[in-house]
A protein has these predicted regions:
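Ubiquitous "structural anchor" signal
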Residues: 99, 196-198, 203, 210, ...
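Short helix-capping/linker segments at secondary-structure and domain boundaries
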Residues: 138-144, 199-206
Length: 290
């Protein structure tokens, strides 16, 4: 201690989100995402103002049947530039397109999708959980460097069953999360090592062919998992929340099918922005036929 000091001064901080305490936190070792709507993108294009609201204020204003009070208003284009620069400089934040996400929501009767897990691969209702599994694509590459489609489909079917079983075996952090997980039985199957799969075949990661391959593999995995789910439902019955969400779920599945078969924009149901269909020009024939 230095002689002559009779006391020590400590900086004081409060817990307000706009305080100095939060502004000095670097946010390292975390995944950060920003959720934006179609209205925000329109405001960016038209260089309009955009108001920000506390979530608590939005809830309170709905309860009190009044217009919410904005905590800040700024130019949408300026905010968009800040998001873009931060993503370029640090790979964060990611973007979650709220309007599109909810237009592809399979259980919209039970509420909107408002959030995701930190990595954003799981998006569903509040207070739900999902066990995740990934298939290593490189393990399904045959001697010609192509995806062994039948082996891949078989693995997808097996792991869909494994993840279904895991719902019963999982431990949940709260009673509500456990109950909703049983109610909807969400499964999280994906794949990994796409970059290596492309690299060993000499395909640039950022290329039309790579995107076509990625889209086709995702389509095969997605619909094979749904087929396995339907197979289990035919024996055991659908998940408890299915019947009240049946119309929305079947609409989403029909839209997935239309994207796979390159349907015209007018055929899609309930979509503001139409999906990019499978690229038949750049997709390898064996994946396209699958």
């Amino acid at each position: 201690a230095k002689q002559g000091y009779t006391g020590v001064e400590f900086d004081e901080y409060d817990t307000d989100w706009n305080s100095e305490a939060y502004s000095t936190v670097a946010g390292q070792n975390a995944n950060n995402s920003v959720r934006i709507t179609n209205d925000f993108m329109t405001a960016v294009e038209q260089d309009q103002d955009w108001s920000l609201y506390w979530r608590t204020e939005l809830v309170k204003s709905r309860e009190e049947d009044r217009e919410p009070k904005a905590c800040q208003t700024l130019r949408a284009s300026e905010l968009w530039e800040q998001i873009a620069y931060a993503a370029w400089a640090s790979a964060d934040p990611g973007l979650q397109f709220d309007s599109t996400i909810n237009e592809w929501h399979t259980c919209e009767v039970d509420g909107p999708i408002r959030a995701s897990n930190p990595c954003s691969e799981y998006m569903f209702l509040d207070d739900t959980a999902c066990n995740l599994a990934s298939l290593n694509l490189l393990r399904f590459q045959n001697e010609n460097g192509e995806l062994d489609i039948e082996r891949f489909r078989h693995a997808v079917r097996l792991w869909t069953i494994v993840l279904e079983i895991s719902v019963l075996m999982a431990q949940f952090p709260s009673r509500r999360i456990a109950e909703l997980s049983y109610e909807f039985r969400t499964l999280g199957l994906g794949y990994a090592n796409l970059g290596t799969f492309l690299m060993v075949n000499g395909i640039p990661y950022d290329s039309e062919k790579a995107r076509a391959i990625c889209g086709a593999i995702t389509c095969i995995m997605h619909m094979s998992a749904y087929a396995a789910s339907a197979e289990m439902a035919s024996e055991l019955g659908p998940f408890p929340g299915y019947e009240r969400n049946k119309d929305g779920m079947l609409r989403v599945l029909r839209n997935h099918r239309r994207a796979a078969y390159r349907a015209s924009d007018r055929e899609y149901e309930g979509l503001t922005i139409k999906p990019v269909a499978i690229d038949s020009q750049h997709c390898p024939p064996e994946l396209l036929q699958a």
